[in-house]
A protein has these predicted regions:
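Glycine-rich beta-strand-centered segment in the early N-terminal region that forms part
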Residues: 31-45, 55-106, 111, 119, ...
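Cysteine-cluster motifs in flexible loop/terminal segments that predominantly coordinate metals
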Residues: 95-152, 156-158
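Local beta-strand N-terminus motif with an aromatic residue
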Residues: 88, 150, 195, 240, ...
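Mid-domain Rossmann-like dinucleotide-binding core that forms the NAD(H)/NADP(H) cofactor-binding site
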Residues: 151-152, 158-160, 164-249, 253
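C-terminal hydrophobic helical "lid"/dimerization subdomain
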Residues: 1, 261, 277-281, 322, ...
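Short Gly/Pro-enriched turn/cap motifs at secondary-structure boundaries
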Residues: 18, 29-30, 62-68, 140-145, ...
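Short, well-ordered coil/turn residues at beta-beta hairpins
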Residues: 44, 94, 267-269, 375
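Glycine-rich cofactor phosphate-binding loops and adjacent beta1-alpha1 units
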Residues: 190-196, 227, 233-314
Length: 376
């Protein structure tokens, strides 16, 4: 079938993106789902920094490619061998498919699935298949097994989690990345305890999700750190106990003074080495630093090893919040419905697919938390 999609043909075009237009809205071919696959109608798709990283080259992908990895959709066709999802079901797309059989999947760590990572890196679906192509022929890649910046997508069954039908599309989409990654880092990777002192460095959709999760987990201090005053003000409105400007040369001393020597848990969500360095240095002796920000693959962090050893510090990476999506999406939705995780507050604005390039500029400037594309 023919579908409209945002296609990235060249990586690294300069900002402003409203002028360089790295994403072109094109008609592309979408093949029928194969065994173990679904065709879904994309209802809403979030614009995430990982999408920007694909466009500016921080996270290289094969091109041409249809970006988009955070979305909610309706199932419109079911391939053979899919027995537990039916036409009409509502689903959240998950950007790391899991095979269910590799060593990591076998021990309950699907975020580390080897075949899932390999298929993502190659721009295909789980198993190496591609269901997208350019009109007239030519390879077209799937971003993270989702390719959600399109009217429809063909995805692996293992790239979706069914959700309640009454959850609004614009809110449901956020659970696929911002919530899984941010809240998962708190509940799964760090497993913070009630009464802990916490800090979040970097207030995008993932960072705000971490902040909300820390509050929900019963953290005593929830400190927010960013470079934009508007985001710091928003953090206070959402329940942060204190906020600090990351550009202030005294920010390290300020946080340590405010917390009596540092926080128990610091979450780096900015995807930049200076943010990771700050997150590490504001933790106390015996503290834990969790990084989920995904900097450029060439970025190197020079760690003072003796401080990590002598002060018994812990550093943890967190990918997709160390989540088991089939468990954690329903879990976080239940917390949202109970008023403990106000995911709806992440939504900055809704846009149309053909407004995506100017939206990239707002994302790059840090002016939005989550812009969500609503498909016509």
């Amino acid at each position: 079938m023919k579908v409209r999609a945002a296609v990235l043909r060249q990586i690294g075009l300069p900002a402003p993106y409203a002028q360089s237009r790295p994403l072109s809205i094109e008609e592309v071919d979408l093949a029928d789902p194969g065994p173990g696959e679904l065709r879904v109608k994309i209802r809403a798709a979030g614009l995430c920094h990982s999408d920007l990283s694909a466009i500016n080259g921080d996270r290289p992908w094969p091109v041409p490619i249809v970006p988009g990895h955070e979305a909610a959709a309706e199932v419109v066709e079911v391939g053979s061998a899919v027995l537990d999802v039916k036409v009409g079901d509502h689903v959240v797309l998950v950007f790391r498919p899991s095979c269910g059989a590799c060593p990591d999947c076998s021990v309950g760590r699907p975020a580390l699935c080897g075949p899932g990572g390999e298929s993502n890196a190659a721009g295909g679906l789980l198993g190496g298949y591609r269901r997208l192509s350019l009109v007239g022929g030519g390879t077209l890649h799937h971003h993270m097994g989702c390719a959600a910046f399109a009217e429809y997508a063909t995805v692996s069954r293992r790239s979706v989690v069914p959700i309640d039908r009454d959850l609004p599309w614009t809110q449901a989409a956020l659970f696929g990345c911002a919530v899984l990654t941010g809240a998962g880092a708190v509940f799964n990777t760090a497993r913070i305890e009630a009464g802990a002192k916490t800090a979040v460095v970097g207030l995008g959709g993932v960072g705000f999700s971490s902040l909300m999760a820390a509050i929900a987990a019963g953290a005593r201090d929830v400190i927010a750190i960013d470079v934009l005053p508007a985001k710091l003000e928003r953090a206070l409105q959402l329940g942060a106990t204190q906020v600090f400007d990351a550009r202030d040369p005294e920010v390290l001393a300020q946080v340590k003074a405010a917390t009596g020597g540092g926080v128990d848990y610091a979450f780096e969500m900015a995807g930049a080495v200076p943010a990771l360095e700050l997150a590490y240095r504001i933790t106390r002796r015996g503290g834990t630093t969790v990084s989920a920000g995904l900097p450029n693959p060439a970025a190197i962090w020079p760690l003072q090893a003796v401080s990590m050893i002598a002060e018994e510090r812990t550093i943890k990476g967190s990918y997709i919040g160390s989540c088991v999506p089939s468990r954690d999406v329903p879990r976080f939705v239940a917390m949202f419905r109970a008023g403990r995780l106000p995911v709806d507050q992440l939504l900055s604005e809704t846009i149309r697919l053909d407004e995506i390039n100017p939206a990239l500029d707002r994302l790059a400037r840090g002016e939005s938390v989550r812009q969500v594309i609503v498909m016509d």
